């Protein structure tokens, strides 16, 4: 073999061997997408599989994900994992998602809205989120399920956004952008400092003042770009450990049953609490309780 050919072969082998390592070094981003806070959705029916205009809601949801994905990839190659986080978690139009992402679908998963998120991710994005249960002007305000009236982590009242941010923080991942209705943005950014986009303006829990979807998606793209530009200064939201969890429910019969779980204590007729050694342990048990009270 001629020397030049031999050197070319060596260069090819070296580049082939380096390719997997280079792929592994790509930044990884996690997107959790709920539905109530998606722009253009102004009635609860649009978030339900049997509701009027649900298919339009799915299309709007998919469009917002693609807007953020486009902003991420405009800055360079990246790995992006999208986790459907609403209801049965089978809402996004998979065939209309940007083909460069991977997608988790289905509700039976240990970590629900943050399934797949671990310490290998550079940052997380929360899209389509809503405010916590009891928020007076929050559009479809709830915390996990309608049966939950309040959730506290280490004496801090949280909604789904803060709960998921606390989990992300426990694995060292900062949330750098969040989007949802105006009540969610106002509430979430009090606790977690992120680039935020109000996709609509909550009027009541059943109605909202909407922006055109194109306007919302343009704002999401711009906000994602700013969030990525400032990523180096972002810090995970960490609540520490152990994690004391307090859950207030609407049904006092349920609290009687939940206290039978080892480590769970009934505080009053509607409230139970427990202490978990880690945020992951706390999250799993909260998920179990949600599933139980939603039956």
Where are these regions (language model features)?
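Boundary at the C-terminal end of the N-terminal hydrophobic targeting segment
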Residues: 18-23
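Active-site rim beta-loop-alpha module in soluble metabolic enzymes
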Residues: 167-175, 179-225
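Active-site glycine-rich loop that binds ribose-phosphate moieties when present
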Residues: 145-171, 177-180
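C-terminal accessory domains and tails appended to enzymatic cores
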Residues: 80, 216, 223-295
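A glycine-rich helix N-cap at a beta->alpha junction
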Residues: 99-117
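Bacterial N-terminal signal peptides
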Residues: 7-16
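Short catalytic helix/loop segments, enriched in acidic residues and glycine
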Residues: 47-67
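Mature N-terminal segment immediately following signal peptide/propeptide cleavage
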Residues: 24-44
